[in-house]
UniProtKB/Swiss-Prot annotation:
EC number from the UniProt entry: 2.1.1.163, 2.1.1.201
UniProt-recorded name of the protein: Ubiquinone/menaquinone biosynthesis C-methyltransferase UbiE
Purpose: Methyltransferase required for the conversion of demethylmenaquinol (DMKH2) to menaquinol (MKH2) and the conversion of 2-polyprenyl-6-methoxy-1,4-benzoquinol (DDMQH2) to 2-polyprenyl-3-methyl-6-methoxy-1,4-benzoquinol (DMQH2).
Keyword Cell wall biogenesis/degradation on entry: no
Keywords from the named record: Menaquinone biosynthesis, Methyltransferase, S-adenosyl-L-methionine, Transferase, Ubiquinone biosynthesis
Top-level taxon in the UniProt lineage: Bacteria
Pfam families named among the record's database cross-references: Ubie_methyltran
Catalytic reaction list: a 2-demethylmenaquinol + S-adenosyl-L-methionine = a menaquinol + S-adenosyl-L-homocysteine + H(+); a 2-methoxy-6-(all-trans-polyprenyl)benzene-1,4-diol + S-adenosyl-L-methionine = a 5-methoxy-2-methyl-3-(all-trans-polyprenyl)benzene-1,4-diol + S-adenosyl-L-homocysteine + H(+)
Upper taxonomic lineage: Bacteria, Pseudomonadati, Pseudomonadota, Betaproteobacteria, Burkholderiales
The organism of origin for this protein: Cupriavidus necator (strain ATCC 17699 / DSM 428 / KCTC 22496 / NCIMB 10442 / H16 / Stanier 337)
Protein's UniProt keywords contain Ribonucleoprotein: no
Length: 243
């Protein structure tokens, strides 16, 4: 069986899927609180930028992959309106349940689907937009997932990847201290789970940098790929198009 990385640890591919699932089953109930604490609320601005770049209009069909607690799906559902179609999907049942309930509590009724991004259960050329926010780095076969995202996007549509990336070099040392000391400490104090947040830091370091992700998206068949560095490269938004 092939090996892959779970953070810095080398594991079998099947084992990684189980370990990642365990992380998100553990953090689901505290996910939103921890996002605010870990990013100082910046994740809301990163998502607002993504929503603005997406340009969703009434009637659009949108697929939100690894949609978690539904921040993007909530905004897209409002923009697409009753004539649109916005799917909230996640591979993790606990995260999907939290996201579904959160949307319902906001009065937003939109379809949800337990979905593996490497095997998307939708037809070719169906969506105007596919988004994945802070989910790609957890996928074992990123190339296969990106190819699937391209497959289900209509010609003229976009695939958008919002993900942690390579921080500006002068900030690397401070960012390492924050990632490997502060994040696990916060995880232990707030969620009672330091290991999951240690994995978060490690998974960020193992994720392709900005230029490497451009190449990965191009290899998947996406064109005119560009990226926007946010907060000195802590996060980057990559946008690829299908023609």
């Amino acid at each position: 069986m092939s090996e892959t990385h779970f953070g810095f640890e080398k594991v079998d591919e099947a084992e990684k899927a189980d370990k990642v699932a365990g992380v998100f089953h553990s953090v689901a109930s505290k996910y939103d609180v921890m996002n605010d604490l870990m990013s100082g609320g910046m994740h809301r601005l990163w998502k607002m930028f993504t929503i603005a770049q997406a340009g969703v209009r009434p009637g659009h069909k949108v697929l939100d992959i690894a949609g978690g607690t539904g921040d993007l799906a909530k905004a897209f559902a409002k923009q697409a309106g009753p004539t649109g179609e916005v799917w909230l999907t996640d591979i993790n049942e606990s995260m999907l349940r939290v996201g579904r309930d959160r949307l319902l509590n906001k009065g937003i009724v939109t379809p949800v689907c337990l979905c593996d991004a490497e095997r998307i259960p939708f037809p070719d050329n169906h969506f105007d937009l596919v988004t994945v926010a802070f989910g790609l780095r957890n996928m074992t076969h990123k190339d296969a997932a990106l190819a699937e995202m391209r497959r289900v996007v209509k010609p003229g549509g976009k695939v958008m990847v919002l993900e942690f990336s390579k921080v500006w070099k002068p900030l690397e040392k401070a960012y390492d201290v924050y990632s490997f000391k502060v994040l696990p400490w916060l995880g232990e104090r707030v969620a009672g789970d330091a290991p999951s947040y240690r994995y978060l830091a490690e998974s960020i370091r193992m994720h392709p940098d900005q230029a490497s992700l451009v190449r990965l998206m191009e290899h998947a068949g996406l064109e005119n790929v560009e990226y926007f560095n946010l907060t000195a490269g802590v996060v980057a938004l990559h946008v690829g198009r299908k023609y």
